[in-house]
Swiss-Prot record:
Enzyme class: ligase
A Gene Ontology BP annotation from the UniProt entry: L-arginine biosynthetic process
Annotated keywords: Amino-acid biosynthesis, Arginine biosynthesis, ATP-binding, Cytoplasm, Ligase, Nucleotide-binding
Location(s) in or outside the cell: Cytoplasm
E.C. number(s) listed in UniProt: 6.3.4.5
PROSITE patterns listed in its UniProt record: ARGININOSUCCIN_SYN_1, ARGININOSUCCIN_SYN_2
Residues that bind L-aspartate: 121, 125-126
Identification of the protein by name: Argininosuccinate synthase
Family as reported in the entry's similarity comment: Belongs to the argininosuccinate synthase family. Type 1 subfamily.
Catalytic activity: L-citrulline + L-aspartate + ATP = 2-(N(omega)-L-arginino)succinate + AMP + diphosphate + H(+)
GO molecular function: argininosuccinate synthase activity; ATP binding
Top-rank taxon: Bacteria
Length: 404
C-alpha cells in the first residue's frame, strides 16, 4: 500500500470511529486525519461530535447536512419499492451508507486526500456497503479499514481509546452498538447476542412499549401522489416532515419494533433489533394503495422486483446496474399510485381500515358487489372455468387411463 498522507474518515462519534483517529495516526503513520460527520437527522448535537473528533486528534472535522437528500433520494425510493429485507427490515440503516460513501468520496476529492477510511468491523454489513460504493464512485482512492485489521474486541477498543483520552459512550458491562438516523435505530451486541434474551425496555427510544402506548386507538390517513407520501391527515408536508410525523404517530402507539435473526452479507446470522416506526407505517400504507391501483400481473412481478431491490441495497449494490434497472421498472409503475390509505394505530399494531383512489382505482363496486346492483355476468364464468382448467382436465383424463 502506498504511504497515505491524508485520509478522510467517516465519523460517527462512536467507539470504533473514535478509536480509528489515533489508530490511523499511530499505527499507519498518517499525518492528516479529516473526519466527515453525516447529519442524517439522528438528533445529536453534531457540533459536539465534531469537537470530539478534534479532541481525539483529527486535523479537521466536517459536518455534512444530508437529511433532505437522505429522505428524497433514498427513503422515498425505498417506500415505492416496499423494501423489506427478510420481509421485516426496511433498510433504515443500510440506506444511509451509500449516501455517506458518496459524500466521503466528494470530500476526499475536494481536499486532495489519498484515501478514505471507515470504522466498520470485519463481520458486519456496513464494510461491504461502504467499500462497494467507494469502489463505484472513487475507484482510484485507497480504502483503509482499521477496525477490520486491528483484531480488537469492543472492550479492547474502548481501552485503546481511553489511552488517548477518548471517553466511551457505552458501558463496558453491556456495550450495545447503536446506529441512529431519521429513519430509525439499529441496536446490536451486548446482551442481545443471546437470541433468547428479551431486550430491556431502555434499548428502545423511538417507540412506546405496548403497556405505555395510549389506550385509545388513533386513525391516520396518508395521501400519496405518484407513489410518494405527500400528506398525513389534511396536512401536506415536506418529505422530511412526512417522516418525522409518521415517526411520531407510529412510535407513540408502539408500532415499528423489529426483533429478527438476520442473514448478513458475510454469511453469518445475527440478532438485530430495529426501530423504524415511520418508515414501516409508510411502506404498509403504500403497499395497500398499490393493491387497488395496480394490475394483478404488475403486482405479482413487482413483488419479485421488491425482494431483489431490497437484497441489492442490503448487500451494498446501490450504485450497481441491476439496482438502477429495477429502479426503472418501479418508477414506471408509480404514476397510477395516487390516493389515500387509512390506518388504525393501537398498541403496537397498524391495521389498514380503508383505501381509495379517485382517478386510478381498479376496484369496481358494481362488479364486486353481491347486491342487486351487481353487473357482473355470472353466466360467462362457466366458459371461463372450462378454458382455465382445460390443461388440468386433459392431464387428469390421461393419468386416470394409465391407472386403470
Amino acid at each position: 500500500m502506498q504511504q497515505v498522507k491524508k485520509v478522510v474518515l467517516a465519523y460517527s462519534g462512536g467507539v470504533d470511529t473514535s478509536v480509528c483517529i489515533p489508530y490511523l495516526k499511530n499505527e499507519y503513520g498518517i499525518s492528516e486525519v479529516v473526519t466527515f460527520v453525516a447529519d442524517l437527522g439522528q438528533g445529536d448535537d453534531l457540533e459536539i461530535v465534531r469537537q470530539k473528533a478534534l479532541n481525539s486528534g483529527a486535523t479537521k472535522s466536517v459536518i455534512g447536512n444530508l437529511v433532505d437528500n437522505f429522505v428524497e433520494k433514498y427513503a422515498f425510493p425505498a417506500i415505492r419499492a416496499n423494501a423489506l429485507y427478510g420481509e421485516k427490515y426496511p433498510l433504515s440503516t443500510a440506506l444511509a451508507r451509500p449516501l455517506i460513501a458518496e459524500n466521503l468520496v466528494n470530500l476526499a476529492r475536494e481536499l486532495n486526500a489519498d484515501a478514505v477510511a471507515h470504522g466498520c468491523t470485519g463481520k458486519g454489513n456496513d464494510q461491504v456497503r461502504f467499500d462497494l460504493a467507494i469502489h463505484a464512485l472513487g475507484p482510484d482512492l485507497q480504502i483503509i479499514t482499521p477496525a477490520r485489521e486491528w483484531k480488537m474486541s469492543r472492550e479492547e477498543a474502548i481501552l485503546y481509546g481511553e489511552k488517548f483520552g477518548i471517553p466511551a459512550p457505552v458501558s463496558k458491562k453491556s456495550p450495545y452498538s447503536i446506529d441512529v438516523n431519521l429513519l430509525g435505530r439499529s441496536i446490536e451486541a451486548g446482551l442481545l447476542e443471546d437470541p433468547m434474551q428479551e431486550p430491556d425496555e431502555d434499548v428502545f427510544d423511538m417507540t412506546s412499549s405496548i403497556n405505555n402506548a395510549p389506550n385509545a386507538p388513533k386513525d391516520v390517513e396518508i395521501i400519496f401522489q405518484n407513489g410518494f407520501p405527500i400528506a398525513i391527515g389534511n396536512e401536506f408536508l415536506s418529505p422530511v416532515e412526512i417522516i418525522q410525523k409518521a415517526n411520531s404517530l407510529a412510535g407513540e402507539h408502539g408500532f415499528g419494533r423489529i426483533d429478527m435473526i438476520e442473514d448478513r452479507v458475510v454469511g453469518i446470522k445475527s440478532r438485530e433489533i430495529y426501530e423504524a416506526p415511520g418508515l414501516l407505517l409508510l411502506i404498509k400504507a403504500h403497499k395497500e394503495l398499490e393493491s387497488i391501483t395496480l394490475n394483478p400481473d404488475v403486482l405479482d412481478f413487482k413483488n419479485i422486483v421488491e425482494k431483489k431491490w431490497g437484497q441489492l441495497v442490503y448487500q451494498g449494490f446501490w450504485f450497481g446496474p441491476l439496482k438502477q434497472a429495477l429502479d426503472g421498472f418501479i418508477d414506471s409503475t408509480q404514476s397510477s399510485v395516487n390516493g389515500k390509505v387509512k390506518i388504525r394505530l393501537h398498541k403496537g399494531n397498524a391495521i389498514v381500515i380503508g383505501r381509495s383512489s379517485q382517478n386510478n382505482s381498479l376496484y369496481r363496486e358494481d362488479l364486486a358487489t353481491y347486491s342487486k346492483d351487481d353487473i357482473f355476468n355470472h353466466k360467462q364464468a362457466e366458459g371461463f372455468i372450462y378454458m382455465w382448467g382445460m390443461s388440468n382436465k386433459i392431464w387428469a383424463e390421461l393419468n386416470s387411463k394409465k391407472n386403470k
